[in-house]
A protein has these predicted regions:
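Short, T/G/N/S-enriched strand-turn elements that build extracellular solenoid repeat scaffolds
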Residues: 91-169, 173-204
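Residue-level marker of positions within ordered structural domains that often coincide
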Residues: 19-20, 84, 128, 150
Length: 204
C-alpha cells in the first residue's frame, strides 16, 4: 500500500503490476491451480488473484525449483522473460502491415494500419501510439484489444474487422474507438466493451 520508487520490487508486486496493465480478467482465473509450485503459501493475499491470472494466462512458469518465489526481488532478466512470455511481436515503425501474427501483438508507435490479417491472441495498442491513428482494416483478433494509446484521431475498426473484447484504459487523455459505417450491428453483436475507471472514451 506504499510507493517506494527507489526500492526493488518483489516478484509478486511485478506480477500484480503487469496483470493490471494487461487488464487480465481475475474472475476468469479464480480456479487456476498453483499446486505445481512449491511454497505457494508465501503469496500474499492481495497478490494471489493477480498471480493466478498470470499463471493461468501462461505468462509465469516459475523457476527451475518449481517456485514462484513471490517475495524475492525480481531481476531485470526475470522481468524481461515475463514480457517475452507475454508479447510475441512488436510493431515499432509506422506503416501498413499485412502478415498474420501468432500470439500477442504490441503496437508501440503511431500511424499504423493493419490490413487483411489475423492476430491469434491479444492486440495491445501501447502508450507509444500516443495521439496517433491506428487502423484495423479487415482484421480478426481472436483475443482482446487493449487500448492504452491512440487519441481522438482514433482507433478505427474498418471493413468487417472482427473483435470480441475491447478494453479502453488510456489514462493520460481521451481515446476514441470508431467502427466504420459499413459495419453492421450484427457483425459486432457479441462485442464486449470495457472502459476502465480512470480512462476516458468518446463515441463518434
Amino acid at each position: 500500500s506504499t510507493m517506494d520508487p527507489d526500492e526493488p520490487i518483489t516478484r509478486q508486486e511485478a506480477m500484480t503490476v503487469v496483470a493490471r496493465a494487461l487488464q487480465l480478467n481475475l474472475e476468469d482465473h479464480e480456479e487456476t491451480s498453483l499446486s505445481q509450485f512449491r511454497a505457494r503459501a508465501d503469496i500474499s493475499a492481495w497478490a494471489l488473484p493477480y498471480v493466478r491470472a498470470m499463471v493461468g494466462s501462461d505468462y509465469i512458469h516459475g523457476n527451475e525449483k518449481r517456485e514462484l518465489a513471490p517475495r524475492d526481488n525480481i531481476t531485470r532478466a526475470e522481468f524481461s522473460q515475463i514480457f517475452h512470455n507475454i508479447i510475441q511481436e512488436y510493431l515499432l515503425t509506422s506503416g501498413t502491415y499485412t502478415q498474420d501474427y501468432a500470439g500477442n501483438l504490441l503496437i508501440r508507435t503511431d500511424d499504423v494500419t493493419l490490413r487483411d490479417l489475423t492476430i491469434d491472441g491479444d492486440l495491445i495498442i501501447g502508450c507509444g501510439a500516443a495521439d496517433g491513428t491506428i487502423t484495423l482494416d479487415n482484421v480478426t483478433v481472436t483475443g482482446r484489444i487493449v487500448v492504452w494509446g491512440g487519441g481522438t484521431d482514433a482507433v478505427w475498426m474498418n471493413n468487417g474487422t472482427d473483435v470480441e473484447d475491447l478494453i479502453v484504459c488510456r489514462v493520460d487523455g481521451p481515446a476514441k474507438v470508431i467502427f466504420d459505417k459499413d459495419s453492421t450491428l450484427a457483425v459486432y453483436q457479441d462485442i464486449e466493451v470495457t472502459v476502465t475507471d480512470r480512462a476516458e472514451a468518446f463515441p463518434e
